[in-house]
Amino acid sequence: MPAVSSAHRAALDALATDLERVFGARFVSLVAYPPAGRDDETHVHSLALVETLGFADLHACLPMVAGWQRRGLAVPLVLEDAEFRRTLDVFPLEYGGILANHAIVRGRNPFAGVRVDPNDVRRACELQAKSHLIHLREGYLETQGEAAAVARLIAASAAPFRALLTHIARLPDASHGSAENVYEDAAVAEEAERRIGISATLVREVLASATSGQTSIADPTALFSRYLAAVEQVWEYVDAWRA
């Protein structure tokens, strides 16, 4: 996990103390993790695992929420430890991302012996890939071919495209295993080219549009055409993948 500032570390320690006060001996652990996308990098995300969780516990946390947010923390995801383990198959991408990239703030290691079934990851990736493809097709029709609108569509879709490729990188690969530490754009692009065969240059162009803005795209329609074909190839890869 990327390093957090000393201020955020202090805020996480304070959060852990608050949760220990609420849950007492039922507190299991608090882990910090980066957001799945890049739209909320100003807040530090965390997962709190406890033995039992009820309405009274949530109500007891209410007076502390504003303070957490003022210190730059997102409201923590609070789950029962057993609940987390039982729903790994329901949220394989979300929980798999936390397993792959986290830092323990306080408590025991809650992930010892825990793994996400690669087949669950594949099914979730297939849904994500097909949804992305459908939304791009629909979005292109809505642009009516207007170049600026096409550029906006590409830029708006870059973050979910990046997330999709990052999730796919965690699927075991026969020749190279899984790439669970692929986070930077350049690494995401290179892994997509190696594994799926889509152009790393194309991936970098699409991802760059999210940060540099759609005005940086010289020929939006030409880029979109290649982008759409690449997403079709991504879906075909995930559809055919087998553990």
Where are these regions (language model features)?
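A nucleotide- and high-energy phosphate-metabolite-utilizing enzyme signature
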Residues: 1-13, 23, 102-107, 186, ...
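Conserved NTP/Mg2+-binding pocket subregion across the NTase superfamily
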Residues: 3, 7, 65-152, 156
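Short gly/ser-rich loop at a beta-strand->alpha-helix junction or flexible surface loop bordering the NTP-binding
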Residues: 27-36
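Short acidic/histidine-centered micro-motifs embedded in hydrophobic/aromatic stretches
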Residues: 33, 101, 209
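Conserved nucleotidyltransferase catalytic core and NTase-mimicking acidic/glycine-rich helix/loop elements
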Residues: 115-243
